[in-house]
Every structure is written in structure tokens, then in C-alpha cells.
């Protein structure tokens, strides 16, 4: 007789808000192994394969956000038919009204689920009243799939792409599970041509996919989660209980945590896509190696920064209407980019700081006569990296803290109670955390050729060697995991 644990079986199919499905969870890793087997069986049956992947993607989203998967379906169906309507008319006002409707649907959903309570507080404060918060659930990844779908309708409006005629293809594009929860934001012009190509995964694609999944899992589940639970959260939850040097180390820890968390997710998403025969563009390119804030935004969350540039900054006028307008457009773009991350004044401040810094750097480039893209070298680059990294860390204080006053408390502690003599004691008390932090920053700052060499080594491993590598990593993750699942940070956006 089979001894079936029906409770465990139920957990596979029923949404649990306390245990959302994420790439680093055990249930996903086992389900993905089964998914790959079915995917390979359907390799010569295109329509069945697209249906299977789309259904799995909706299941994946249901396990992350429950019944709110209907929002994903709503955005998909509405934008598909809006784009079809735009393609069928050459009347200017009809096309413009259609893209405005797409904007209203996507941004309206985003505004309700993400900004209702924030805007209520703002208006109540302005009018001298009070606002009682609504209990509104924030669906995972809503900022990502609305922006991704919006880029499609805007591109159709601009006549940059030809709209799809098959709803299944569009549903596949919007819901493709590797990037559904937290990006990268994949452009239609890059992804859609890949949908109906014959399934092909080269030896190099397979090897790089395994390497990216392994490195992403290592960054997320071993480095990011461990330093978060065992150090960073304690500092940020009560900064006034800790000295300035402890707060500063906490900020450095968060800078590494958010990078390893988000780039780890992106690496896993890109790696999983490669195993399925799809190519995504790189989303992170060693951002803390940047010698200027402009370079940082060319390396950090590349899919979002390029989206903001192409669909917001350029739409505002970009650099075409004079320097003053360019600087204002940069600040406005980053202000809205801050709001995209969350409904809080902390995110507004974070975005404004980055916008002002970008404008200041553009002004400095003009003042010194340096050309766009011109890189510094030697000692100038070293100090550029040092200054940029610490500016970004300063901004992370506002990004991470729950409110503005806590951010100011942390800055005050760093400036007034530094106490460097406590550093040896701090290292002794948290030596495991600092070993992982040192390892994380070392891996980040090591030359790109080292990463490429590691990738080639994994690619050359036989299939059994790759399996042993993944099993060993999974075992290590299980040994080091905290008692609770640590969702990816960008799931909340």
C-alpha cells in the first residue's frame, strides 16, 4: 500500500500566504525537475508546450499570490486586444485613446493595490483629517508584469513592433514564470520572436544555465538570507540600540544583501530561461564597481533603468530640450522610479537623491568637458568607486527603513556614536556574518574573467558532475536556512 501524505500533497496545490513559492524553496526545485521532464516530452509539440508553460506559470503565480492571478489574466487579455485594435486603425486619436486606456488599466491597478493607503494619508494630511487604512493585499510582481505589458502596448503605439495575433503567445510572454515575480522586465521585441522558434538548448546554454542557477541560489539563500536574518535585520529594526560602527556595518551588510538577493533572483531567472531555450538580457553587471552614479544605473537593475529611460525619461523630452530640462527630467524620472519601488516617503527620498545625483553628475560632465561613456582610470576610478558606493549605501538607509525618522536615527548613530574600538568585539560576535560579507564583496569585485572561467568549468562538467554540484548546493542551503522562508526583497514591489 502506498502511504500518501495528503497534507503534503495539498500543500503542493493550495496557496499558503506564509509559504509563497519562490525559486529557492524546496517545493519549487522538485516541481521544476518534474516540469523539465514534461517540457522535454513536448519539445516537438509547440502549441501543447506553450499551453503547458503558460498553465505552469499561472500555477506558479497562484502559489505566490493566491487568487490574484486573475489580475495577470486581466492585464494580458486587455492589452492584447488593445494592441490588436491599434494595429487595425490608422486614426491618430483612436490609437492615442487606446494607449491611454492601456495606461489607465495598468497604472490604475498599480495605483489601487500599491498606493491607495499612501495617497489617502497624503490627502488626509493636506486636508487636516485622518485616513483609515484599507487592508489591501499587494500581489507579487504586479509592478513588473504591468510595466512589461505596458511596454508592449507603447511599442505597438509607436509602431516599433507588430502586435501578436495569437492570445496564447501573448499570455506566454506576460506570464513566463522565470521573470514573473521580480523581473527582469523583458521587452516584447526581444522575447516574442523566440516563442515559436524550435526548441534548442546548446551545451553552452545548458552549462551557463546551471551556473547561473547555482550562483543565484548561492547568493540568495546562503549569503543574502544569512546576513539578513543574523545581522542586518537586527540593526535596522533598532538602530539606536547599536553603536555607529555597528550601524555602518549594518548598512554595508544591507548593500550586499539586496544585491545578492535581487541579482541572485535575476541570475536564477536567466538560468532557468536558458534551460528552456530562451535568452534574457543581463540585469546586473557588478554595480558596486561603478565610478559614478550614472554608471551605477547602467549596471543596477538594467531592465528597469532602461525601461524608465525609454518610456519615461525620453517621453518627458530627455536631453532634447536643453540642459535645465534634462536635469529636471532626470529628477522626475527617478522620483517616479522611487515611487515604483513602494508607497512610502522613504522611497520618494531615495528616488530624489538618485535623481539629483544623476543631474549633478551630468552637470559635472558638462562643466569638465568629459564625453558620455568616457571612463576614468587608476586613482581617479578608485576614488570614484569609493564615493559612488558610499553614496549608494547612504541612499539604501532610506530605502530599507520603514520610516523617515528611523533613517535619521541610523544616520545620527553613525555620525555621533561611531566607537571604532568596538570593531574587534563586533567581528568576534558576528564572525560568520562577516566571513560571508567578505566573501560576497570579494565575489562581486573579482574580475569578470574569473566568473567566465567558473562558468566554463561548470559547462565542461559531465551531466553527473552538474547534478552533484546542484545537490551539494541544495544540501548547503538546507543546512544554513532560517526557520522561515525569506522571500525575495523585490517580491514586495
Task: List each language-model region with its residue ranges.
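Membrane-embedded transmembrane alpha-helical bundles that form the catalytic cores
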Residues: 2-492
Amino acid at each position: 500500500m502506498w502511504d500518501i501524505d495528503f497534507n503534503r500533497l495539498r500543500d503542493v496545490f493550495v496557496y499558503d500566504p506564509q509559504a509563497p513559492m519562490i525559486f529557492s524553496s524546496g517545493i519549487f526545485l522538485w516541481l521544476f525537475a518534474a516540469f523539465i521532464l514534461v517540457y522535454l516530452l513536448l519539445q516537438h509539440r509547440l502549441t501543447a508546450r506553450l499551453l503547458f508553460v503558460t498553465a505552469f506559470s499561472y500555477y506558479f503565480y497562484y502559489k505566490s499570490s493566491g487568487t490574484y492571478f486573475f489580475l495577470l489574466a486581466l492585464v494580458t487579455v486587455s492589452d492584447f486586444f488593445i494592441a490588436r485594435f491599434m494595429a487595425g486603425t490608422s486614426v491618430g486619436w483612436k490609437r492615442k485613446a487606446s494607449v491611454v486606456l492601456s495606461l489607465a488599466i495598468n497604472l490604475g491597478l498599480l495605483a489601487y493595490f500599491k498606493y491607495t493607503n499612501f495617497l489617502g494619508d497624503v490627502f488626509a494630511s493636506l486636508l487636516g483629517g485622518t485616513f483609515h487604512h484599507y487592508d489591501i493585499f499587494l500581489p507579487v510582481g504586479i509592478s513588473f508584469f504591468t510595466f512589461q505589458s505596458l511596454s508592449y502596448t507603447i511599442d505597438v503605439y509607436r509602431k516599433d513592433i507588430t502586435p501578436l495575433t495569437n492570445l496564447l503567445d501573448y499570455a506566454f510572454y506576460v506570464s513566463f514564470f522565470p521573470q514573473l515575480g521580480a523581473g527582469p522586465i523583458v521587452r516584447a521585441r526581444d522575447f516574442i520572436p523566440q516563442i515559436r522558434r524550435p526548441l534548442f538548448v546548446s551545451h553552452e546554454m545548458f552549462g551557463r544555465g546551471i551556473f547561473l542557477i547555482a550562483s543565484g541560489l548561492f547568493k540568495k539563500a546562503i549569503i543574502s538570507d544569512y546576513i539578513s536574518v543574523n545581522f542586518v535585520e537586527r540593526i535596522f529594526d533598532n538602530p539606536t540600540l547599536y553603536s555607529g560602527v555597528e550601524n555602518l556595518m549594518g548598512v554595508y551588510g544591507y548593500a550586499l544583501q539586496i544585491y545578492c538577493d535581487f541579482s541572485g533572483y535575476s541570475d536564477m531567472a536567466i538560468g532557468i530561461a536558458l534551460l528552456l531555450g530562451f535568452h534574457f538580457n543581463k540585469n546586473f553587471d557588478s554595480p558596486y564597481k561603478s565610478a559614478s552614479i550614472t554608471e551605477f544605473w547602467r549596471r543596477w537593475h538594467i531592465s528597469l533603468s532602461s525601461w524608465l529611460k525609454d518610456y519615461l525619461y525620453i517621453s518627458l523630452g530627455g536631453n532634447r530640450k536643453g540642459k535645465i530640462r534634462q536635469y529636471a527630467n532626470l529628477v522626475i524620472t527617478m522620483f517616479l522610479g522611487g515611487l515604483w519601488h513602494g508607497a512610502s516617503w522613504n522611497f520618494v527620498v531615495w528616488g530624489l537623491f538618485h535623481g539629483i545625483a544623476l543631474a549633478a553628475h551630468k552637470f559635472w560632465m558638462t562643466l569638465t568637458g568629459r564625453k558620455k561613456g568616457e571612463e576614468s582610470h587608476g586613482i581617479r576610478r578608485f576614488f570614484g568607486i569609493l564615493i559612488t558606493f558610499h553614496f549608494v549605501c547612504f541612499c539604501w538607509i532610506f530605502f530599507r527603513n520603514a520610516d523617515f525618522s528611523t533613517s535619521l536615527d541610523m544616520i545620527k548613530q553613525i555620525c555621533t556614536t561611531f566607537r571604532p574600538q568596538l570593531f574587534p568585539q563586533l567581528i568576534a560576535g558576528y564572525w560568520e556574518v562577516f566571513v560571508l560579507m567578505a566573501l560576497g564583496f570579494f565575489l562581486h569585485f573579482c574580475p569578470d574573467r574569473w566568473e567566465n572561467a567558473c562558468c566554463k568549468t561548470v559547462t565542461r562538467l559531465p551531466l553527473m558532475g552538474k547534478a552533484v554540484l546542484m545537490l551539494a548546493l541544495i544540501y548547503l542551503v538546507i543546512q544554513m536556512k532560517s526557520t522561515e522562508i525569506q522571500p525575495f526583497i523585490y517580491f514586495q514591489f
